[in-house]
Amino acid sequence: MDRRTFLGNLMATAATLPGSHLTFSAEQAEIPSYLRGYETLYGQDSHAAALEWFKNAKFGLMMHYGLYSQLGRGEWVMLHEKIPVATYEKMKETFNPHQFDADAIADLALDAGMKYVTCTSKHHEGFCLFRTKQTPYNSVDSPAQRDLMGELAAACRKKGLGLFLYYSYSADWHHPYFYSRSAGWDFARPAYDQPQPEYLWRQDADFRLYIDYVHNQLRELLTQYGPLAGIWFDPVMGFYARPDLFPLAETYALIYSLQPQCLISFKQGANGSEDFAAPERQRPGAAPNPFRSILPSRRETANEVLSRAWHINQKKQIELCNTLQPNGWGYSKADDGKHRHAEEVIQMINSAWAAGDNLLLNTGPLADGSISAEDVKTLREVGRHIRGGSASSISVRREKGESS
C-alpha cells in the first residue's frame, strides 16, 4: 500500500470514529499558512504539497537552545564535561528565557529571506522546551513557565513560516531508560566515573519505556501546536549504533497519522523512507564512515544501514545544515566575535542552490533567549543581498527550468 492510499484510508476511518484522536479541527482542516499558494495540490495530496513547498523554500533558520545555553560551552557540554545528572538538572531552576521573542525571531527569518524555522524542542540533554505531561523536566514547569515551542508555532503561523520541530530521538542523557554506552555507542551517556542512580536501563527490553515516552511526546507536539512543516530527528549516529532498538516504521506512521502533510527528516537517512535528507555541512562521501564512537562489533552494520538509507535519500531533496558559529550549534562564548559574515553565508547559499539543495543556517541563542547581535546583523545583510538578486538569481533560473 502506498503512502497516499494509506493516508486516504486512515482519514476515512478517522471520520467514522467519534472522539477519535485523528479527527481534525476546523483550523487544521484549512490549509496551513506556510502552504498558501499550494491550495490546488494540497486539496489533492497534502503531503505532495508540503514536499513541493519544501523544495521551493530553499532557506531556513535553525536554532539550538536549551539549558546548555546558560553555560555557553556548546550543546554537548553535559557529555563532554561529564556533568552529573543531578547537577545538570539544577539548571532548570535558573533557566530564564526572558529575551526569547518568537515574533522577533520570525521577523528575523523573514528579513533574511527564509521560509521556515527549525528549533530544538528537545536536545540530547533531555530538557523539553514545550508543554508535556511526560516529564517535569520542561520549560513550562520551570520557574520561567514558558512554552517556547507554542510561542514559536503561533508566530510562524501568523507570519506564514513553516515550523520544523527538532527532536532528539536517538539520544537522551536524562531519560532513565535510554540505552547505555556499553550497549553500542560511546555518546549514549556521558562517561561518568561513578554510576548515575538516575540511569535504570539494564537490558534491551527496557528501551521500550523510552520509545513509549518519545511517542507520547510526539503526540503532544503534533496535537498542541497546529500544522507543523515537519519533525527533524537527530542524532542519527545513535540509531546507526542500535537500529534494532528503534521502531522507525511505527514512529513515522504515528507522525503521518496525526499530521499527513508533516515531513520527516533524520539527517542523511535512517531507513530511507524519510521525506528529505539533512546532512551536516556537506553530503556524505563514498568512503565508509569510521564510526569511531560506535562499538567495533557494530560498525559494519552501521555502515550498511547508512549506505542503504543514503542511496535512497540522495535522490530526494537535500537540506544542508550549517552554523553561523564556526564550531558548535548551541551558544559558545568562545566563538564571540568569530561568527560567519554575510559574504560567507552568501557563498553557502549559492553553493547549495546551485546543487538544488536547501540551506538550513543555525544560530545558538544566548542564555536569555536572545539572538547574537553578530548573527542578527549577518542575517539582515543576507536578506538584503537576496532581495537585491545577489543570491536569488540561481533560484530564479531553477524555477524557469534552466540549468544552473
Regions found by a protein language model. Give the residues of each.
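Mature catalytic domains of secreted/periplasmic carbohydrate-active enzymes
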Residues: 8-12, 26-404
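N-terminal twin-arginine translocation
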Residues: 1-5, 14-29
